[in-house]
Amino acid sequence: MTTPAPLTGLLPLNPEQLARLQAATTDLTPEQLAWVSGYFWGVLNPRSGAVAVTPVPERKMPGVTLISASQTGNARRVAEALRDDLLAANLNVTLVNAGDYKFKQIASEKLLVIVTSTQGEGEPPEEAVALHKFLFSKKAPKLENTAFAVFSLGDTSYEFFCQSGKDFDSKLAELGGERLLDRVDADVEYQAAASEWRARVVDVLKSRAPVAAPSQSVATGAVNDIHTSPYTKDAPLIATLSVNQKITGRNSEKDVRHIEIDLGDSGLRYQPGDALGVWYQNDPALVKELVELLWLKGDEPVTVDGKTLPLAEALEWHFELTVNTANIVENYATLTRSESLLPLVGDKAQLQHYAATTPIVDMVRFSPAQLDAEALIGLLRPLTPRLYSIASAQAEVESEVHVTVGVVRYDIEGRARAGGASSFLADRVEEEGEVRVFIEHNDNFRLPANPQTPVIMIGPGTGIAPFRAFMQQRAAEGAEGKNWLFFGNPHFTEDFLYQVEWQRYVKEGMLNRIDLAWSRDQKEKIYVQDKLREQGAELWRWINDGAHIYVCGDARRMAADVEKALLEVIAEFGAMDIEAADEFLSELRVERRYQRDVY
């Protein structure tokens, strides 16, 4: 599988050199990175008295514009791999993040390829929201001279599987674009589909665009300034869990943990706004229960990625057990001829509801059957890492990384169930135990470059995590810009996450304003969006003063409710209608003044 960084075995740098290089460049802007690149090229190719001249090709080569619209990094990895394939075929390619793409130039594109994921309820990734809105607006141009292809990544456990890719594909065709290839919709196990699609794209584009001389093949755009690290999703760092502290009260309905992980001397670097990827082990007790329900022993040999493993080991480390999907329910029903599940087959809504409310182990318990080991793993999806917003800044914690974990716990007919990664960190990794981690960089959730810029942070629940990192960074830098936090949770006494730290920031003058919404401390429920409306006039003043707005947390409900409140505030105090307010907020998004990290 292709990773965000080249395989270290193919690089002229060893892991330590790569780590030092990353540490030296982690805070540089794309423009600064480009300058450094040119500087080293000049060092390598000194020409006394020569003036650098950009060679002009004999004829302009048709270029391929490749747009990466990524939420968790997978779409970016596919786009980067396709970029490399196109360069190897000597084709001109411009790879760009959707958030950096000047979408009004889309009418001039001849060859356009989009690799996109989907988030929430079928919404485009955060970095692609502006492009999506533009294409679906009255301003979208005709695209009769544009040929396009779309690769869509999704997760069949969600109702609106690959909806963003479906949207882009249908809209580009509706605007007159020529579809080069049928859209591909890939589930979480996307690698094989992506590899096949990439090969087809290269073949098609080679027939559409003349092959350039190697010196003419170029790759430009923000995505090319990637973060290089010897540790990746497929080659994670084996780190140490040093602190596991419950930060909700004993009477809280929530179990939230502050987790600290020691990165040692790995040199692994991150920035506020990045996420920590965590590979986890399924609960051995859950594996034992599932195996016994199917009348298996756990020692049956199965093949995983070409290796033979005992079934129990394969289930613990290689397969998703805590998230059910409509496809799994349908396939299990068909395979076992279950009388209770077969009536659901063909009814998408019922399948989705059943999968969302019934874990895999309970599906088997309620509809027992006998399967052999290979049939069982054939039903399951591969284990994927969980991403957690980083709650620390290395300017303060150095070789540590902190995350805020809401532990998923619930009962199914009296049987305790838990989330895979959250219970792994909270219950099964002892302090000083090993955990495999990597950094998922998120350049679409960054503090302002100007330290004097005001910042508005909206993060209920565990959405508070990146704002702890933001404040640590701003404090370490002595940033003079004002800071305003909106936080909410059920109860003040039980659920005020990092309360002492926020109070200290207020006392020190670093946190200029804090508005708190406790939804269960009074008869009428109060949420952060209510506080936004309550502070509308002051909020509008901050926006007019150039403030950047950040939202982190639940994508399904909170993010939409917060955006609705922001639109109402902009409309009321900006003296405009909702449509104009929506345009205003879209402009803030394009200017990177409205950024969201929602999940």
Swiss-Prot record:
Function: Component of the sulfite reductase complex that catalyzes the 6-electron reduction of sulfite to sulfide. This is one of several activities required for the biosynthesis of L-cysteine from sulfate. The flavoprotein component catalyzes the electron flow from NADPH -> FAD -> FMN to the hemoprotein component.
Biochemical pathway: Sulfur metabolism; hydrogen sulfide biosynthesis; hydrogen sulfide from sulfite (NADPH route): step 1/1
Subunit structure: Alpha(8)-beta(8). The alpha component is a flavoprotein, the beta component is a hemoprotein.
GO CC annotation terms, alphabetical: cytosol
InterPro entries assigned to the protein according to its UniProt record, in alphabetical order: CysJ, CysJ-like_FAD-binding, CysJ_Proteobact, FAD-bd_FR_type, Flavdoxin-like, Flavodoxin/NO_synth, Flavoprot_Pyr_Nucl_cyt_Rdtase, Flavoprotein-like_sf
Positions bound to NADP(+): 519-520, 525-529, 561
Entry's family note: Belongs to the NADPH-dependent sulphite reductase flavoprotein subunit CysJ family.
NCBIfam families, sorted: cysJ, PRK10953.1
Known cofactor(s): FAD; FMN
Domain FAD-binding FR-type: 234-448
GO MF term (any one): sulfite reductase (NADPH) activity
Signal peptide span: none
GO BP term (any one): cysteine biosynthetic process
Ranges annotated as spanning the membrane: none
UniProt enzyme class: oxidoreductase
UniProt cofactor note: Binds 1 FAD per subunit. Binds 1 FMN per subunit.
Residues holding FMN: 70-75, 117-120, 153-162
Pfam family, one: NAD_binding_1
Keyword tags: Amino-acid biosynthesis, Cysteine biosynthesis, Electron transport, FAD, Flavoprotein, FMN, NADP, Oxidoreductase, Transport
Protein name stated in the entry: Sulfite reductase [NADPH] flavoprotein alpha-component
Catalytic activity: hydrogen sulfide + 3 NADP(+) + 3 H2O = sulfite + 3 NADPH + 4 H(+)
Record domain Flavodoxin-like: where: 64-202
Enzyme Commission number(s) from the entry: 1.8.1.2
Residues reported in the UniProt entry to bind FAD: 322, 356, 386-389, 404-406, 410, 419-422, 599
